[in-house]
Amino acid sequence: MVLVASIRRELASGLRGQVIGPGDARYDAARAVFNGMIDRRPLAVVRPADASEVVRCIEFVRRHDLPLSVRGGGHSVAGHAVREGAVMLDLSGMKAVQVDPATRTVRASPGLTLGEFDSATQALGLATTLGIVSMTGIAGLTLGGGLGWLNGSYGLACDSLLSADIVTADGQLLRASTEENEDLFWGIRGAGSNFGVVTSFEYQLHPVDLVLAGALSYPLRRAPHVLRCYDDFVKAAPDELSTAVSLGLTPTGEPVVFIVVCYCGPTDEGEQLLHPLRTLSPMDDSIQRMPYLALQSANDAHFPSGRRHYWKSGWLRDLSDGAIETLMQFLPRMPSSASSVGLQHMHGVASRIAPSATAFAHRTEQYDFLILSQWSDATDSDRNVEWTRALFREMQPYLEESVYVNNLGDEGLGRVKAAYGQNYPRLVALKRTFDPDNLFSANQNIDPSGT
């Protein structure tokens, strides 16, 4: 076995990036990720400075037959960025971003967070679809699809991806686009972590300045009526209006339902569109004209890094009476006031793209249903996990078999297949071409054997 000291010597020779191993004062911080449930000890943490150093790292782990994991933002609930006894390739130091206002495009490095990316593009009044928590990394979000507030107008994050530079398992640095390595480009738009390490993303940007955004809140006693009205409301929503529901508890333990909105259009039109939701007599109404950048960071305080997380997720076509009744039964028993049940509405451009156009296959208008349980005290883990599993079990009659891959924990091959649906066989064939030995296996893994 290659000793850590040998790894550090060989990799650090001529490397501008960092190599951190056990015993280093920086080691525990380097191996920590968003989900405090993840406590794994990699053999070494390597922070490359650029694509050439990523190539060196890939060649090194292949030469020494070492397991590998890759970290972008470290924000996934599964914690695949950290693997026991592996070389952890940490891209967080790669933060270059170049915006071209003439072509409305941006070239961005994989270590950027959503907040860093948005700050650069919003300086010129531009944006592309990204997630809804600014500490999330752009890499994992995009490679898994990328739902966000602009999905109705511009599709998912991966739908605005124009090209990507990717280091494959054999150490080649390839460009993937609709003109080069087209099959690889298809695969990385939804299943990207399986095929290599993306060192640069090129996105199409769109004009986004001020948005009409905020939340309406309603008490539990009115929630069934509110949710039925909301379900009807969103089915007639224009592309420019994106919405989500969040069910949770107030700090005093009172169940509450939030409807969160983002309208990318004229304020007067948006106010008219939102009138039906306001007639439902919300307890609070924070909807206002605000910078898109402010909306993108509005959720950050609710998701501090280091809390313990356990999630369950699936696609939900309709808010049926049975689904609503189940939610009403479970919400008052939610063990942690930090937890929530979310329903992010996917519609518009994101739902009109063909399921076979990208590896992300779930293109029907529907809700991304997510039970997002989070808590701080390790002694509370059992009851939070049990509550999450119980609610997910009772919601099964109303959920599709499919799931958004970015919401998956370590849930087995069946759930990975469900995440890719009809596209899974093509992804297996692509995996055999670009990673037949499954070097990139610390992910929602597509097994090249097809099993």
Predicted segment positions?
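Soluble FAD-dependent oxygen oxidases
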Residues: M1-T451
